[in-house]
């Protein structure tokens, strides 16, 4: 197969996954945005975590809220728990890598805050512990997952929201996660500041 054909095949796979996800995920993305808006209106904040590419997604989400998405508006409170290398490495060294997010959540999380927990498999041990810590702090969890939802899905409470991408290929799940994050940012802005359309 020549390279351009391979590229077209990858684009097509991404398009098909997004089309399937659009039908399945729209109500869950809407619900998650409402949970986030409610928290923000009640002086809550967003905490976000993930590993690898999902760590990048957590930072992307928090930067869109702290700075701006597609319009000028006041900054919104969001913290990516993936950015402080001194904190992360000290927790990993002194305790366990599985606690790098949960210890931060226990210190920073407050009742009514929202945790955006991102894992393509749903089985990342440190994300599972983060969800448990968020529940201990009476936070609501929005989980971005894929495949069968993994261990994360079984931990979620009725007030939590799972946005589970209907795919098994990690790259396709990540692509939909980013689109879902952009949808969340757009819906948060439109609910808080009005629609620009």
Curated annotation (Swiss-Prot):
HAMAP family: GmhA. Residues 36-197 form the SIS domain. InterPro entries: GmhA/DiaA, Phosphoheptose_Isoase, SIS_dom, SIS_dom_sf, SIS_GmhA/DiaA_subfam. The lineage of its organism: Bacteria, Pseudomonadati, Pseudomonadota, Gammaproteobacteria, Pseudomonadales. CDD domains: SIS_GmhA. Substrate binds at residues 51-53, 64, 93-94, 119-121, 124, 174. Belongs to the SIS family. GmhA subfamily. Binds 1 zinc ion per subunit. This is Phosphoheptose isomerase. It comes from Pseudomonas syringae pv. syringae (strain B728a). Its cofactor is Zn(2+). Catalyzes the isomerization of sedoheptulose 7-phosphate in D-glycero-D-manno-heptose 7-phosphate. It holds the Pfam family SIS_2. Its EC number is 5.3.1.28.
């Amino acid at each position: 197969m020549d390279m351009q054909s391979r590229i077209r095949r990858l684009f097509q796979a991404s398009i098909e996954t997004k089309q399937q996800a659009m039908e399945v995920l729209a109500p869950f993305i809407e619900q998650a945005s409402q949970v986030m808006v409610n928290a923000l209106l009640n002086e809550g904040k967003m905490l976000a975590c993930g590993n690898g590419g999902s760590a990048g997604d957590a930072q992307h989400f928090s930067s869109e809220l702290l700075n701006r998405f597609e319009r000028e508006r006041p900054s919104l409170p969001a913290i990516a728990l993936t950015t402080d290398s001194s904190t992360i490495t000290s927790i990993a060294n002194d305790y366990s890598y599985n606690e790098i997010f949960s210890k931060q959540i226990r210190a920073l999380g407050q009742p009514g805050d929202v945790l955006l927990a991102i894992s393509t498999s749903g089985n990342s041990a440190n994300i599972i512990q983060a969800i448990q810590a968020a529940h201990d702090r009476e936070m609501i969890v929005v989980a971005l997952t894929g495949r069968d939802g993994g261990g994360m899905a079984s931990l979620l409470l009725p007030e939590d929201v799972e946005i589970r991408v209907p795919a098994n290929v990690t790259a396709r799940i990540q692509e939909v996660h980013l689109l879902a994050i952009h949808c969340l940012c757009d819906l948060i802005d439109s609910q808080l500041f009005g629609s620009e359309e």
